[in-house]
């Protein structure tokens, strides 16, 4: 029996044997193919260097094998085993090369097809521009007709509030009410002032309904009738006085209210200006009277100092003093003005003045 010089269990297993034990893994194969393709595309120089190193390693291994063959004669069985191993390695290398070539062929075959498949889609996208749908413009709608109706209330119950009036009409089925306008009652100057009562009373008013029909029916049914309600109510015995205003709109009412308000303000403005003028005239008179009183006092003091009135004159002197004072009040005050030195009335020869003026002007110009 021949003894085994190599221990198969202690030797390092080759990569080919490991691959045969693991079996075929498609994911791993695809990863390895991808890695090989990437290396060939990007790192060509590194691959060349690695090939040179592998060739150099193979040459060294061949030299070592030759020296061993020369030194030790081996049996036929060992030589046949090694030859078989080398054949297997060559076949494995050929298989790997074939796989790489097939991968390259498949990538080359798939790339034009993919480019063709992608190109029509891109061309279709570019050739078909996005069509913007034109939205139809909104048709110009005609303005809605104003179908509101307005009624006029010539008189209102005392201390009736606007929301109470609205609730009264709506409870009787006349609605919907859109707007209510009541004019406050202006108290007359002769009427006594009531400071304790803070409630307001209104003279007349206007009520706008959403439809003309309800306004007409309301005016026809409630006009000249009592307000009604609870028997002991505050407004039970008061009478409605209302009229439907044909062709009258709320805008017309606002114009009328504004016009009346402007007229009222204009009258008040005129009255204010008139009152200011009267006050101004009165103050001027008061000031003038004070001035005259001061003048009288000064004149009396001067007369007393001079001693014009003697002790034996009696009643005649007193009457004369009163008459003099009355005459002084009526006399206008005169102020002495300064005279012009070279007036025309004082210049005798006007021609000489004109000659002098001409001479001076001729020198200047």
Curated annotation (Swiss-Prot):
<feature type="compositionally biased region" description="Basic and acidic residues">
    <location>
        <begin position="55"/>
        <end position="67"/>
    </location>
</feature>
<protein>
    <recommendedName>
        <fullName>Pre-rRNA-processing protein esf2</fullName>
    </recommendedName>
</protein>
<dbReference type="GO" id="GO:0034462">
    <property type="term" value="P:small-subunit processome assembly"/>
</dbReference>
<feature type="region of interest" description="Disordered">
    <location>
        <begin position="293"/>
        <end position="322"/>
    </location>
</feature>
<feature type="compositionally biased region" description="Low complexity">
    <location>
        <begin position="111"/>
        <end position="129"/>
    </location>
</feature>
<keyword id="KW-0690">Ribosome biogenesis</keyword>
<feature type="region of interest" description="Disordered">
    <location>
        <begin position="1"/>
        <end position="146"/>
    </location>
</feature>
<keyword id="KW-0698">rRNA processing</keyword>
<dbReference type="GO" id="GO:0000480">
    <property type="term" value="P:endonucleolytic cleavage in 5'-ETS of tricistronic rRNA transcript (SSU-rRNA, 5.8S rRNA, LSU-rRNA)"/>
</dbReference>
<dbReference type="InterPro" id="IPR039119">
    <property type="entry name" value="ABT1/Esf2"/>
</dbReference>
<dbReference type="InterPro" id="IPR035979">
    <property type="entry name" value="RBD_domain_sf"/>
</dbReference>
<dbReference type="InterPro" id="IPR034353">
    <property type="entry name" value="ABT1/ESF2_RRM"/>
</dbReference>
<dbReference type="GO" id="GO:0005730">
    <property type="term" value="C:nucleolus"/>
</dbReference>
<comment type="function">
    <text>Involved in the small subunit (SSU) processome assembly and function, and in the 18S rRNA synthesis. Required for the early cleavages at sites A0, A1 and A2.</text>
</comment>
<keyword id="KW-0694">RNA-binding</keyword>
<dbReference type="GO" id="GO:0003723">
    <property type="term" value="F:RNA binding"/>
</dbReference>
<keyword id="KW-0539">Nucleus</keyword>
<dbReference type="InterPro" id="IPR012677">
    <property type="entry name" value="Nucleotide-bd_a/b_plait_sf"/>
</dbReference>
<dbReference type="GO" id="GO:0000447">
    <property type="term" value="P:endonucleolytic cleavage in ITS1 to separate SSU-rRNA from 5.8S rRNA and LSU-rRNA from tricistronic rRNA transcript (SSU-rRNA, 5.8S rRNA, LSU-rRNA)"/>
</dbReference>
<feature type="domain" description="RRM">
    <location>
        <begin position="149"/>
        <end position="239"/>
    </location>
</feature>
<dbReference type="GO" id="GO:0000472">
    <property type="term" value="P:endonucleolytic cleavage to generate mature 5'-end of SSU-rRNA from (SSU-rRNA, 5.8S rRNA, LSU-rRNA)"/>
</dbReference>
<comment type="similarity">
    <text>Belongs to the ESF2/ABP1 family.</text>
</comment>
<feature type="compositionally biased region" description="Basic and acidic residues">
    <location>
        <begin position="20"/>
        <end position="34"/>
    </location>
</feature>
